[in-house]
Amino acid sequence: MEKVLRFFLFSLCFLPLFADFAVKSFQELRNQNLVRQSYEESCGAASLATLIRLIDFKRVDELEVLEYFTKDSKGNINTDMVSFLELQKAAQKMGYKSASYQMDREALEKVQIPLLVKIEDDPRFPHFVVIIN
């Protein structure tokens, strides 16, 4: 009996070496599909990448989305004051169907899918975010 117990305890010591998953905190699990904004004016690209991760489960990042934005004559990506139309065109270039709607808060609270929303507390500084009801 003692040999069996020793063998069992010995086996338990090496069990963590064979674990093939990492333990994640609740915050890590909650934010695993979140794409953080890397540049001052790239909230639209980060929000679109987050939305794609949530809906299509593709690992799209912000830089990948920025490649689909309109470029200026020098080939630079313009992220200054991005509109819904530009985000819609980028999504369509990536192969997604998209549409823009204006709705009041009451209708917004009834929607049960993630949405990309433009916040305009100050019209000079619009901001894009993803909301999940």
Describe these PLM feature segments.
Residues R6-F10:
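Sec-dependent N-terminal signal peptides
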Residues F21-E28, L34, E67-N133:
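Conserved active-site-adjacent core of cysteine acyl-enzyme catalytic domains
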Residues E2-V4, F14-F69:
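Active-site-adjacent structural segments surrounding the nucleophilic cysteine of cysteine proteases
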